[in-house]
Amino acid sequence: MSIQKQFFGYQSLGFLKRVTFMAMAMVACSSVASVTFGQGGVEIDAKGVFQSRALIDGSGVLDRQRLKAADAALNADIKKQSKFRKVSLNRMEAEFAKLKKAGKPLPPEMEYMAGLTRITHVFFYPESKDIVIAGPAEGFFLNSGNNVVGMKTGAPVLKLEDMVVALRSYGPDAKATKVISCSIDPTRQGLQNLKQAVSQMQARNFQAGDAAAVVDLFRNALGMQKITVKGVSPQTRFAQVMVDADYHMKLIGIGLERAPVRIDSFIDKASPTVVAKNSLQRWYFQPDYDYVRVSPDETAMELDGGGVKLVGESERVGNGGVRKGTGKMNRASTGFCRSFTKMYNALAKKSPLYAELRNLIDMSVAAAFIQEMDFYGEAGWGLEVFGDESQFPVEKYNAPTQVAPAINAVWKGQYFMTPIGGGVNIQPQAALQPDTMKVDDTGKIEKAKKAVEFKDLADGQWWWD
């Protein structure tokens, strides 16, 4: 899975006072008004225009109240913290079908996947035809940031609607989805307008006090940015989390948002003298597992590693705003990517949004493995209910289609740069390549699989510890 960022840099001629200006033009997409993530939230209006908004409960009073209410409402079993909770996906679908037929609502324990906070294993049991995912789990509650998180760890729990989106992307009758992506791109006309705006600035006697005017000039030149989502419906929560993560990562990169952990931003490292004219820095997230281990019979998989890393490359912008990859990346971008990757898990503990993104990667890789090994066919599971939008709707939100650029102004050295960017690119099959997918010859995964028992499950039970 991967998230793409693009930064567009121009070198200026020196100005009279040899003072330079770095205008960081940032674009991104994010989630719909009724859903909030991370440390704040977002809005998408009927025209598809994205806008970020903050939701803060500095006192913690609301969190404590909601935690107390959830503690009283949830049953004792699901509130238990478990290192290894199991969820049978096809049993869960069968139970949901019964509830739907009886006119009953989706229960919280199903909506939030029995409190799973990660997927660490996928198992298939030929005897019972169960397709099982497993991982750590705990009781959950809706916190003041409108994130459903664990009662003990504060980690976001998996959402069934996101899992369904992943399963549909790698379903029993579908071709493997090559990429799940969100891109936020300046238009060609916008890039041409920006080049003209830069030329105007080069012809002027630029002063420090003109920074606000320059920001306005660039914002107007760039215009609205186009948002494109591929691989999943843009009207899903899955898509909204992807693009929201992209948006906030970019804010950190250009210095408009301070991360809750120490991350060296792009502008911390940027040296304008080495940023090539008309260059774009493209950043994107992808799976970061040390190994994806499988059992010798390929009926079990373990995800081992952090889950997410940030990588990138440079592009060049030619006439007419046409972009072409160079296969290279400057030192500032390399430093930012390495720092972000190194601190990702620490960041995810502080900011639920990045843990949400990691969960999407876990779910996508799990779904791709299920499809790759044809567990659907082996289990005789056609995803009949979860795969049907009329029976289990997930396309419920306004689709983000455009966003205005956000501009940051930073003085740096003798040069003038305008980085621009945007995008998300998730490639779960990258985690299933021969260089990362290893056969487990220690027996560890097989042992974990055999430890799962079905004999004591009650009728309709689809999760257990």
What are these regions (language model features)?
Residues 9-12, 23, 126:
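Intrinsically disordered, low-complexity regions enriched in small/polar residues
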Residues 17-31:
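Bacterial N-terminal signal peptides
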Residues 1, 30-36:
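Domain-wide signal for the mature, well-folded portions of proteins, strongly enriched
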Residues 1-16:
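N-terminal secretory signal peptides that target proteins for export/translocation
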